[in-house]
Structure formats: structure tokens, C-alpha cells
Amino acid sequence: NPNGSPLDPHQQQQQQQSQDMPHFGLPGPQPPSSQQQQQQMQVHHQQQQQQQQQQQHQQQMQMSLLPGPYRPHIEEKKLTRDAMEKYMRERNDMVIVILHAK
């Protein structure tokens, strides 16, 4: 059959395409969703970091502002958290940096 040999590579190509298409189609929708999750996690992590930094900063300020008897660590932490929440409420110019993972 003279048509047999030219048809073979063409059929192979079609088979490759049908195998490749699901392979190419799957990663398309997936990365954006995992990217968004990454982004949200990063934002959440950064907000936590910011709060921790503020807590540390305020702890240092309290330590220098409050001479006198040494306060128990737990009480001090509670005070700092209250101060931090008050600070977060009063400050409206908070800047949150969002990193976009590529």
C-alpha cells in the first residue's frame, strides 16, 4: 500500500498531539490557584511578622520607659499585645507589602 508509509508519521503526530494536549492543558489552570494560595499565605505571614516587629519594638520602649520592679514576662507580653492592638486601631497609614510569586 503506497499510502501506508506517508500516513504512519501523520498518525503518530496525531497521537502525540492528543497525548500532549491534556499534558499542556492541565498545568494551565493549576498554577494561578496555587499562586493565589502562596500569595495569601505570604500576606498572612507578613502581617504576622509586622505585628511581631511592632510587639518587639513596643516591648523595648516599655522596658526603657518603665523603670522599677521587674515585671513577670507573661504580664509584660499581655500589656504589649494590648498596646499593639490599640496601635493598630489608631494607625490608619499601615502599609502592607504583597509579594507576587511568579
UniProtKB/Swiss-Prot annotation:
Residue span of region Disordered: 1-72
Keywords per UniProt: Activator, Cytoplasm, Developmental protein, DNA-binding, Notch signaling pathway, Nucleus, Repressor, Transcription, Transcription regulation
Domain of life per record: Eukaryota
Keyword Transcription regulation attributed: yes
GO cellular component: CSL-Notch-Mastermind transcription factor complex; cytoplasm; nucleus; polytene chromosome; RNA polymerase II transcription repressor complex
GO terms, biological process: crystal cell differentiation; imaginal disc-derived leg morphogenesis; imaginal disc-derived wing vein morphogenesis; long-term memory; negative regulation of Notch signaling pathway; Notch signaling pathway; positive regulation of G1/S transition of mitotic cell cycle; sensory organ precursor cell fate determination
Positions with biased composition (Low complexity): 33-64
Molecular function as annotated in GO: DNA binding; DNA-binding transcription activator activity, RNA polymerase II-specific; DNA-binding transcription repressor activity, RNA polymerase II-specific; histone acetyltransferase binding; RNA polymerase II cis-regulatory region sequence-specific DNA binding; RNA polymerase II-specific DNA-binding transcription factor binding
Family listed: Belongs to the Su(H) family.
Subunit structure: Interacts with activated Notch. Interacts with Hairless, this interaction preventing its DNA-binding activity. Interacts with insv (via BEN domain).
Function field: Transcriptional regulator that plays a central role in Notch signaling, a signaling pathway involved in cell-cell communication that regulates a broad spectrum of cell-fate determinations. Binds directly the 5'-GTGRGAR-3' DNA consensus sequence, which is present in the regulatory region of several genes. Required for neurogenesis in imaginal disks. Acts as a transcriptional repressor when it is not associated with Notch proteins. When associated with some Notch protein, it acts as a transcriptional activator that activates transcription of Notch target genes.
Name of the protein this chain belongs to: Protein suppressor of hairless
Provenance organism: Drosophila simulans (Fruit fly)
Lineage, top ranks: Eukaryota, Metazoa, Ecdysozoa, Arthropoda, Hexapoda
Gene: Su(H)
